[in-house]
Amino acid sequence: MTEQMTLRGTLKGHNGWVTQIATTPQFPDMILSASRDKTIIMWKLTRDETNYGIPQRALRGHSHFVSDVVISSDGQFALSGSWDGTLRLWDLTTGTTTRRFVGHTKDVLSVAFSSDNRQIVSGSRDKTIKLWNTLGVCKYTVQDESHSEWVSCVRFSPNSSNPIIVSCGWDKLVKVWNLANCKLKTNHIGHTGYLNTVTVSPDGSLCASGGKDGQAMLWDLNEGKHLYTLDGGDIINALCFSPNRYWLCAATGPSIKIWDLEGKIIVDELKQEVISTSSKAEPPQCTSLAWSADGQTLFAGYTDNLVRVWQVTIGTR
C-alpha cells in the first residue's frame, strides 16, 4: 500500500496562464489563483465530480500579468505582484484593493508575507528586492550584494527564531538575507541556469531551488550549505514542500514530480492526458503548485489556463 496522487478535477475560469495558486488553513474551501489574464480568481471549492470549484469573484485592478499571489495568515487579505510594476493588497471579504505598492521600476515577479504578516517582500526585473510594511511604504531596498539579474522569487522563512529571506534570480544564485539588517548571509552557488523558484520547508530548516537546469537543489538554512540535488529532467517552474509529509513537489515542464526526501525517491509523477491532434503540439506546461493546508490536495496551474486538482490516495502499485 503506497500513497499516490489521483486527478480529482479541474478549475476553469482563467483566460491566461495560471501563474500562482494560494491556499489558507482558515478557509479550506477557498483558493486563489493568479493569471496572465491580469486577474486573481477566488474559487469556492465544491469538489463536485464535474466541476471541482466555481469562480466566486475576480480581483481586478492590475494592468498587466499577475505573477504571484499569497494569502495573509488570518485568511483576510491577499497580496499580489504584477508585471505592471506594482503590488496590491486585497481585502478578500470585499474583493477590493486596500493598498497599492509603487516603487519597482520594472515587472514584479514575486511577493511574500512574513509569518507575522507585518512585513512584505518583493522581487523584480529591476534586480532589486524591496521590503515594505503593510501600509505600502517601502522600508528598505536591497541593492548591496543583490542579484545581478532579474529577481525571480522571494520567500520568508516561516521560522521566527531564524528571521531570513531567501531569494533566487536569473544570475543562477540563491541568496539568504538576514531580515534584521537586510544583509546577505549566504550565497548558494551550484545552479548552471537561470532560476525560477525557491521555496522554504514548513519548519524553516531547508529550502529548495529550481529553474532552467532542471535540478532541484536543497540547501540547509541553519548551516548555510548544499545538502543534495534531485534531477527533475526538465525546466523547473515551481517547487513546494508538502505541509505534513517529507515530500517536495516540482513542476517540471509539462509534468509534476513528487519526491520523498527521506529516500530521495519519486513517489509519483503527474502527467495530464493530452489528446493532441498534431504530434507537434506542445503539451501544457505546469507553472504553479500549492498544497492544501492539510496536505491532502495538490493544486497545479498550467499554460492551458486550467487548475488541475490532485488528491493523495492510498493505492496498490
Curated annotation (Swiss-Prot):
GO terms under biological process: cellular response to glucose stimulus; cellular response to growth factor stimulus; cytoplasmic translation; gastrulation; negative regulation of cell growth; negative regulation of endoplasmic reticulum unfolded protein response; negative regulation of gene expression; negative regulation of intrinsic apoptotic signaling pathway in response to hydrogen peroxide
Modified residues (N-acetylthreonine): 2
Gene Ontology terms, MF aspect: BH3 domain binding; cadherin binding; cyclin binding; cysteine-type endopeptidase activator activity involved in apoptotic process; enzyme activator activity; enzyme binding; identical protein binding; ion channel inhibitor activity
Modifications after synthesis and translation: Phosphorylated on Tyr-228 and/or Tyr-246 by SRC. This is required for binding to SRC.
Any single GO CC term annotated in Swiss-Prot or TrEMBL for this entry: small ribosomal subunit
Subcellular location, principal: membrane
Tissue spec: In the liver, expressed at higher levels in activated hepatic stellate cells than in hepatocytes or Kupffer cells. Up-regulated in hepatocellular carcinomas and in the adjacent non-tumor liver tissue.
Subunit structure: Monomer; also forms homodimers and homooligomers. Interacts with CPNE3. May interact with ABCB4. Component of the small (40S) ribosomal subunit. Interacts with the 80S ribosome. Binds NHERF1. Forms a ternary complex with TRIM63 and PRKCE. Interacts with HABP4, KRT1 and OTUB1. Interacts with SRC (via SH2 domain); the interaction is enhanced by tyrosine phosphorylation of RACK1. Recruited in a circadian manner into a nuclear complex which also includes BMAL1 and PRKCA. Interacts with AR. Interacts with IGF1R but not with INSR. Interacts with ADAM12.
Name under which the protein is recorded: Small ribosomal subunit protein RACK1
